[in-house]
Swiss-Prot record:
This is Tyrosine recombinase XerD-like. Pfam families: Phage_int_SAM_1. It comes from Streptococcus equi subsp. zooepidemicus (strain H70). InterPro entries: CB (IPR044068), DNA_brk_join_enz (IPR011010), Integrase-like_cat_sf (IPR013762), Integrase_catalytic (IPR002104), Integrase_recombinase_N (IPR010998), Integrase_SAM-like_N (IPR004107), Tyrosine_recombinase_XerD-like (IPR020876). The active site is at residues 213, 245. Belongs to the 'phage' integrase family. XerD-like subfamily. GO terms for cellular component: cytoplasm. Putative tyrosine recombinase. Not involved in the cutting and rejoining of the recombining DNA molecules on dif(SL) site. It is found in: Cytoplasm.
């Protein structure tokens, strides 16, 4: 079925970002169901989306349904299949923050810069402004640490083995900044645009730099870090703003 993805995309008028997102979702779908498209394989595919947000789930189902209709029109499929993409809304007086399945953040992508920005927020809790100021000299990939200097002092952060390959690829360039624009950092808006394009490509358009930072907090809390330790990792003067995460 993978062979039909490009002809399907060519039949639609899609912006480049949307086309990348469609391609990612459809390759994921084809890898899961293989050549057998039937009610059973589609049900298993739907079940695999259960951990996603409602918006991401609806987007993936809509994309796959369009693809299934295309395959039926092209007589690749003898029967027309359509998955129910209606997502029941759930309401709560108090929004509940939960840890997300972030495996898609580490998958192969065409949006490499946006991916690295997302991972730096997700794994280290950095803000876009802090990321903009990162220099290659701040990293010691051999010792797997980042030394981030600010007016409040130096924060030493451990780089995970999962993050390391993404940094090693970026460090191959001979430049001053991790994200370098003629030996100067890019604008803050550039970082938000790169992050947005990547998040859209993996079906997580509803996420933001702030929500990824919240994931970092939740993950550190789940790992047993105290509120004081997380505040120090984030470079905060006080842990007051973190109290809501520890009262959950």
């Amino acid at each position: 079925m993978i062979a039909f993805i490009e002809p399907f995309l060519a039949s639609k008028s899609l912006a480049n970002n949307s086309q990348q997102a469609y391609r990612y979702d459809l390759r994921q779908f084809c890898q899961q169901v293989g050549q057998r498209i039937n009610p059973e394989t589609l049900a298993l595919y739907q079940q695999s989306l259960s951990s996603l947000t409602a918006a991401a789930k609806k987007r993936k189902l809509s994309t796959v349904n369009q693809f299934l209709y295309y395959l039926y029109q092209q007589r690749v499929l003898a029967d027309y299949f359509k998955m129910d993409d209606r997502i029941e809304a759930s309401f709560s007086l108090k929004p509940q923050l939960t840890r997300l399945d972030t495996s898609a953040f580490y998958a192969e992508t065409a949006f490499l810069k946006g991916q690295l920005i997302a991972l730096l927020i997700l794994e280290l809790g950095l803000t876009p402004s802090e990321i903009a100021g990162l220099r290659l000299a701040d990293f010691d990939l051999g010792l797997q640490v980042l030394r981030l200097q600010s007016h409040r002092g130096i924060r030493v952060m451990t780089l995970s083995r999962t993050l390391l390959p993404f940094l090693e690829r970026a460090a191959e360039a001979q430049q001053l900044y991790l994200f370098d624009h003629d030996a100067k950092p890019f604008s803050r808006q550039w970082f938000f645009n790169q992050l947005r394009d990547f998040l859209e490509s993996i079906g997580c358009a509803e996420l933001s730099a702030q929500s990824l930072r919240e994931q970092f907090i939740l993950n550190e809390k789940a790992a047993g870090k105290s509120i004081i330790e997380v505040a120090q990792l984030l470079g905060l003067k006080s842990p007051i703003t973190l109290e809501k995460y520890y009262k959950m």
